[in-house]
A protein has these predicted regions:
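Structural/interface elements that position substrates and couple domains in central-metabolism enzymes
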Residues: 1-435
């Protein structure tokens, strides 16, 4: 099948590459000619484990192409995926200017039946607005489908190739048939393909992400309570997660969630509810808890030191989660801002995200070439992202490099007995302090 993918950001590039991997002819569109040239020359523009191998293979074999011409991309294609940004406005609503702008353009250049697919995360009713925008200029047959993505950064290729489920929202059997054919190679093991109306599909994505964000904020509140009551959040987490009605995932406490999805989608669902005069109280609390949790280590730091002016801080992790270079809404960025405002000097390391942080924060931090390099002369260590390479460090080496053996762990990477054995002062989330 010939497919056009409009947008070469995270969702567009992963989707386009993975569709090409099963034999489809995919042409991706982006208005940025420099980006198109880089991609056409085999230079991948995002970090995602496993993606580059598929990207280069399909580019070489001619199944994956790039252009800045929408007309060229849709010529002869059966399906057009819209994988465009929907950034939050000042009021939290999703900005649909890019989605609706492309829909308007499609209406002016389409000449035959197409299935237009919203792959972006969009508010309920967007499919109707896309349909109206296309129909304003094109009077032929077409369908608009909502097909939300459920990709987790860091494992997105596996998520796409072996999805838990495929949600397809459409209003015609013809559209369902086209989408079923396209997704058939990915659901051979019986993963469910769920047919529903477009509005239900649109809400499904927001509801899923908002529920996961709710689990995180709930567990972070439990962690705060553990600190006040003398309980251990790791033990509580295991006890709660063993109930299969709840499950073990998304119950790890920390310094809050970030990324391109959870913050934006929770905001957008709150705004969508408000637009129909519904006050989504739970999600407002989820946002409030997360905003507070991003600063959860600061009171511990200030309680320990009193004043950190002139202190050198080693910071491990900048990306919002491991196995990605995505720094959108990353807790580490707020940590850098807060620490530097209090007069500290930050020495940071991340395996993938340093260039992205440097581009927006400049010289607010010193960027080091290894985790151990950050520790040279540091007064204390802050851990903001749970990269695998941080989990089993050489504690003896850390002791030699640091001025003071103090760790503030925002991701609970280390066992309490381990840091105690090595003589560290250790603060984590929802557990006893080691002093």
């Amino acid at each position: 099948m010939k497919i056009a993918v409009v947008g070469t950001g995270y969702v567009g590039l992963v989707s386009g590459t993975c569709f090409a991997e099963t034999g489809n002819d995919v042409i991706c569109v982006d208005i940025d000619q420099t980006k198109v040239d880089r991609l056409s020359n085999g230079q991948i523009t995002i970090f995602e484990p496993g993606l580059e191998v598929l990207f280069k293979r399909n580019l070489k074999e001619g199944r994956l192409k790039f252009t800045n011409s929408l007309e060229e991309a849709i010529d002869g294609c059966a399906v057009i995926f819209l994988a465009l940004p929907t950034p939050p406005g000042e009021d939290g609503s999703a900005d649909l200017r890019y989605v609706l702008g492309v829909a308007d353009h499609l209406g002016k250049i389409m000449t035959d039946y197409k299935v237009i697919v919203d792959k972006s995360t969009v508010p309920v009713g967007t499919a109707d607005r896309v349909r109206d925008a296309v129909a304003a200029n094109y009077k032929g047959d077409f369908d608009v489908v909502s097909n939300p993505e459920f990709l987790r950064e860091g494992v997105a290729v596996d998520d796409f190739m072996k999805p838990d489920r495929v949600v397809i929202g459409a209003e015609s059997q013809r559209a369902f048939d086209v989408m079923d054919e396209l997704y058939a190679p990915y659901v051979r093991q019986g993963n469910p393909v769920m047919h529903m109306d477009t509005r239900s599909a649109e809400l499904t994505k927001y509801a899923a992400n908002s529920f996961l964000a709710t689990k995180i904020s709930f567990m972070n509140e439990i962690a705060r309570l553990c600190e006040l009551l003398g309980a251990d959040v790791d033990m509580v987490r295991k006890g709660v997660g063993s109930d299969d009605r709840i499950g073990k995932r998304f119950l790890f406490p920390g310094i809050g969630y970030g990324g391109s999805c959870f913050p934006k989608d929770v905001q957008a669902l709150v705004h969508s509810a408000a637009s129909v005069d519904y006050d989504f109280k739970i999600l407002k609390a989820v946002e409030e808890v997360n905003a507070e949790q991003k600063k959860a280590l600061l009171p511990k730091i200030m309680q320990h030191y009193g004043n950190i002016e002139g202190k050198i801080v080693a910071l491990w992790g900048l990306a919002f989660k491991p196995n990605t270079d995505d720094i959108r809404e990353a807790p580490a960025l707020e940590m850098i801002e807060a620490l530097t405002e209090l007069g500290a000097k930050v020495r940071a390391y991340d395996p993938e995200a340093m260039a992205n942080v440097k581009a927006i924060m400049g010289d607010k931090a010193t960027f080091c070439d290894s985790s151990y390099h950050t520790l040279e002369g540091a007064d204390f260590l802050v851990i903001a992202t749970e990269w695998p390479e941080f989990r089993t460090p050489d504690f003896s080496k850390i002791q030699l490099l640091m001025k003071d053996k103090v760790i503030f762990d925002g991701r609970n990477l280390f066992e309490l007995d381990t840091v105690k054995k090595h003589g560290f002062t250790y603060y984590s989330i929802g557990r006893s302090d080691i002093k």
